[in-house]
Structures are given as structure tokens and as C-alpha cells.
């Protein structure tokens, strides 16, 4: 029996044939990705966290106001959603998913047996169970937002010290959301990548940029010049640090992101649920009214780059996706299926209102 570390290195990953299965899902009127906020609870209070924004779930209740589940009800509820949607890939987010680690220890093997690839996104504030490393189709993504000078302030109590302790002997991916303060010190970007590239527990490093809501003005927001610099400076680092996943095309998508959810391939391909397992998170995983012109989502950027790849002559992947979505929408309509994303049908364009002037008293 190989050790958990060896087993992890042999885990299956999404391949070209899986993308063909995904295409088949779309033609059948089903979205190939599913995201579930499995709990409203989180011991962190991170500035700029979209999940706890007042408009994350639109004009309804906030995430903290929803009723969530635990025990058998959570296990059965998540598995039932996966059976309903039949996705190729499931993301389990929060809140902090590891608050429900007992339930996850039942959910994750069940999803693996169904042939579903699963990613758990965690702060690693709670230790990751060692036996999860033996689940073939499971990936753990640990959020580490900057070097300790920023991360330990923003994401306490999930400090560097606690993360390194809780991932010891595991296999994880690192997900980094870059914010404005991290752009101020020369060498910061490479220092971060070099540190995590050197950790034996880390398989890959993913990068996203902070994505604001429309009308937002916050210290985390990046300027257009910042995005251009990141698109220029980060891709060369992948040649020095092999764990960094940073295609040139993905970096360019940060500079020219999708103009709207209708143009975002990730938004079209994913159905997203909040902690009551019935409220939809729209128009994408960010919820609320995200400023797509400043989108920095790593998955959105990667898919936005991919959809521009030529297939044959002037035909691009985007053309095939649009045609497939049109077919899938009709199939879902005739089968009375409501599992597909809302943005598979035309939506009224959101108008960006100017921010209100606040008068100090």
C-alpha cells in the first residue's frame, strides 16, 4: 500500500477526454460544474470577503442569515444536489468547509465513488484529515493571501504558522488572491512564489486577482497598471518555479477579462448554491454585482483564454460553446429541467450606478 503522499501524486486529473464528457453535459442541458457553500460558519473575518457581503445573495438574506445543515442532513443534501446536476467537477466552499470536516469525511468518498472530481477550498485554520489524501479525485486548495506581513493580518487566526502545521504531510494546492498592498514592495511576487514552491506539501500554486463589486472603493482594489504589471511579471516566474500555474494567455485575460457574465465561460459552466442548498449564487461564484471589467478569478481567466483558441480556421472554442449552450437550453426546456445556469438565457443588462456621495458630519 503506497503512502498517502505517493497516492496523492498518482491522483487522476481532468484530461481532454473529460472535457469531451463536459461538452456532452452541456448538450444535454446540464452545467458541468457545481459550487456549494456547505456552511455559513467561518472563524475568519477577512476584509473584502465576497461570501459575507450584504448583496452576495442578491436582495435576499445574507449568508450568515441562511439556515445551513449539519450531520446526515448536510451529507444527504450535498449528495442529492450532485445527483440532480450530475456535474463533472464540484467545488465545496464556505464559510470554512472544514468546520464540517466530519460530514465531509462522508461526502468526499461518496462523490469520488460517483466519479466526480471535487475541490475543497479552505483556509487550513483546521487540520486537514490525513485519510482525505487517499481519495483519488479530491484536491485541497488552501487560501494564502500574500506573505505573512499581509496574510496573517487579513486572515487570522489562519496564520502562516497554523497553515504550515495543518498541512504537514499532506498534498495541497495554494491559492493566492493578490491585492493592492502586495504590489508596493519590489520582489514581493517572487518571494511568495519561491516560498510556496519550496514546500514539499504543495503540488501547484494558483493565482487570482482581487475582484471588486461594482461601485466598490477599497484598499484591496488593483489599478489597470497593476494588472498590466502582473500580466507581465508573473508568467516568467513559472520557468523558475515549476509549481506555479501561470499560462501567458491566462495572464492576458486579467488585462482583458470577460465584459459580463454572459461573456464569461466559467459563469456559464457552473451552477452555484449557498448554504441552505437551495438559494442560487448569481451571476457567478462571487454573487452580488461583480465588476467584470476588473475580474481576477483564476478559473474565469483560464477559461476566457481557452475560449479564444482556434479549432479550425476562424472557428474558435467560444463558437462551439455558444452553439452547445443554445442546444442545451432547448433540451433543458423540452425536458422541463431547471438545473442549468440562469445566464444560459438572455438577462437584462445591469446599469452601473454612480456611487452616492457621503457627507461627513
Descriptions of predicted regions:
Residues 1, 61-62, 114, 137-271, ...:
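Radical SAM enzyme [4Fe-4S]-AdoMet core and its adjacent flexible, acidic
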Residues 2-131, 319-326, 361:
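Conserved alpha-helical substructure of the radical SAM core
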Residues 36, 40-43, 258, 286-289:
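Processing junctions and N-termini across compartments
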Residues 42, 46-49, 264, 284, ...:
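Short cysteine clusters
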Residues 48, 52-55, 270, 298-303:
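Secreted/processed peptides and extracellular or luminal domains of membrane proteins
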Residues 118-123, 270-272, 279-281:
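Short, hydrophobic beta-strand segments that form beta-sheet elements in well-ordered domains
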